[in-house]
C-alpha cells in the first residue's frame, strides 16, 4: 500500500462517552425526547447532519448541529481516549514508510484538535474531516486522494463502520474493516471488505496477506 486512510471515531479513538453526552445534551436543549442509547450508538459513524435529519423535524436540524458541535468542542472531545495498541500500530506502519492519513466525517477542526490532544497528530501526513464542501466519507476520501495525488489502487481505508466501507468502495480504494470499534462485525461483512482486522497490531500483517 502506498497510503492508508484511518477513520477516527471507533477506529483510532474511543470517543463514545463524549459523543453520547453531546447528543443527549443536544436533545435536552431542544426539549425533545432523547433516543435510546442503542440509537445514539448508531449515530457514531454517519455524518452528524444525517443523524439529526433522521430523528428531528427539519426546522431543528441546523440548530441541533450547532448545539452539538459547541458542546462537543467545549466538553465532549476531552472525554476521548485512544484504543489500546493504537500508538504501537502507528509506529509500526510508520516504520514501513507507509504514509498515514486521517479521513473522518467529524468536523475537521475538531478532528485535528483531538489528534493533537491525544498525541497522534505527528504520525499523520494529513488529517481531513468534514466541512461545508465535504459532508460524507466519500467526499473526504476523494479530497485526500486529490490533494496528495495518491493512486486509488494502492490506497486503503481502515474503519469500524459501514460508512467507512461504503465511502472507500464508492471512490474505488481498498477497504479494511476493524472489529474493535462501534460497528457490528456481521454488518461489516455484508459489505465485503478487502481486509478484516481484529487488533491494531494486526493491521500491518493483515495488509501483507
Where are these regions (language model features)?
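Short secondary-structure boundary segments
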Residues: 105, 179-181, 200
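Substrate-recognition element of Asp-dependent hydrolases with the DxDx(T/V) motif
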Residues: 23, 89-115, 128
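Conserved H-loop
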Residues: 33, 120-125, 151
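Acidic, Mg2+-coordinating phosphoryl-transfer loop and its flanking beta/alpha structural elements
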Residues: 156-196
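Conserved Lys-Pro-Asp/Glu-containing loop-to-beta segment of HAD-superfamily phosphomonoesterases
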Residues: 3, 137-165
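N-terminal helical cap/lid subdomain that shapes the substrate entry/recognition surface
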Residues: 2-88
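A short, structured active-site edge motif that brings together acidic residues
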Residues: 121-135
Amino acid at each position: 500500500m502506498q497510503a492508508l486512510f484511518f477513520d477516527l471515531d471507533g477506529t483510532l479513538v474511543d470517543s463514545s462517552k463524549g459523543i453520547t453526552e453531546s447528543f443527549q445534551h443536544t436533545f435536552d436543549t431542544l426539549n425533545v425526547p432523547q433516543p435510546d442509547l442503542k440509537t445514539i450508538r448508531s449515530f457514531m459513524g454517519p455524518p452528524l447532519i444525517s443523524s439529526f435529519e433522521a430523528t428531528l423535524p427539519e426546522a431543528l436540524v441546523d440548530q441541533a448541529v450547532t448545539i452539538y458541535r459547541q458542546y462537543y468542542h467545549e466538553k465532549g472531545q476531552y472525554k476521548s481516549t485512544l484504543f489500546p495498541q493504537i500508538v504501537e500500530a502507528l509506529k509500526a506502519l510508520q516504520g514501513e514508510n507507509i504514509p498515514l492519513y486521517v479521513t473522518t466525517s467529524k468536523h475537521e477542526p475538531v478532528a485535528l484538535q483531538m489528534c493533537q490532544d491525544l498525541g497522534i497528530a505527528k504520525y499523520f501526513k494529513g488529517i481531513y474531516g468534514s466541512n461545508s464542501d465535504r459532508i460524507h466519507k466519500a467526499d473526504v476520501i476523494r479530497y485526500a486522494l486529490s490533494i496528495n495525488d495518491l493512486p486509488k489502487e494502492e490506497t486503503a481505508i481502515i474503519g469500524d463502520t459501514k460508512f467507512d466501507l461504503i465511502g472507500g468502495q464508492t471512490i474505488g480504494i481498498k477497504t479494511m474493516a476493524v472489529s474493535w470499534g462501534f460497528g457490528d462485525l456481521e454488518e461489516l461483512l455484508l459489505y465485503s471488505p478487502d481486509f478484516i482486522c481484529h487488533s491494531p497490531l494486526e493491521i500491518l500483517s493483515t495488509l501483507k496477506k
